[in-house]
Amino acid sequence: MVIGVDTNSRVVDPNDIKTWPLFGDGAGAVLLERVEENQQNAGLLAWSLGSDGRGSNLLVCPMSGTRQPVTVEGVTAGEQYMQMDGRAVFKWAIRLVEENVQQVVHHSGVPMESNDLFILHQANLRIIDGIRSSLGLDEEKFLVNLDRYGNTSSGSIPLALDEAWRAGRIGPGSTVLICGFGGGLAWGCLLYTSDAADE
């Protein structure tokens, strides 16, 4: 089982009108199981994972209790809240996700247009549209739910997967590309085909 959960309401400054409206609290879980060897072309087809600490200052919560312990002075200064260089994160996300999607698609051998659905971390509609545009794909290939939930951080992909299954956008034999990205800066993309026996 893979679980993604974040309570962003605890780390986003409610007085920050640029950031507060973008985030939501959310949780989701995905149950994984082994694919039998005789089920060719099912399961995980390709993946890419990475991180680049040079961008660690672009998305931070300075007084998170690890490197900088919580203090009264820090709380008074608002250092318990997330700080983000939105423009730099935007540029990084579009470039990096597009590169990693291309890499995963290449390694999988599945043509880009043959993928049934793309589920990206629901960070920002402009980022999703920028990535979609750079890949030359139609809007219908992408699931977007951040208009209803906001950016739920690590909850966004499990929530989107659940929504896609319930809506019939993913079914037995569907090929789905998933890509997450965020603080650190870190990212992960994978391409999988649903088991024909999945329900």
Locate the predicted segments by residue.
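Conserved small/polar residues in nucleotide/adenosyl-binding loops
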Residues: Y192-E199
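Conserved catalytic cysteine-centered active-site region
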Residues: N38, S133-L161
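Acidic, glycine-rich active-site loops and adjacent beta-strand->loop/helix elements
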Residues: G4-S9, G50-D52, R148-G150, G180-L185
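Condensing-enzyme catalytic core mediating Claisen C-C bond formation in acyl metabolism
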Residues: D16-K91, R95, E99, F181, ...
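Glycine-rich phosphate-binding loops at beta-strand->alpha-helix junctions
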Residues: N115-S134, Y149-N151, G155
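Active-site-proximal alpha-helical scaffold in enzymes
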Residues: I3, V30-V35, S154-I170
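Catalytic phosphate/nucleotide-handling subdomain of diverse soluble enzymes
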Residues: D162-C179, L191
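Phosphate/pyrophosphate-binding loops at sites that engage ATP/ADP/AMP, CoA/4′-phosphopantetheine
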Residues: N100-S114, A164-R169
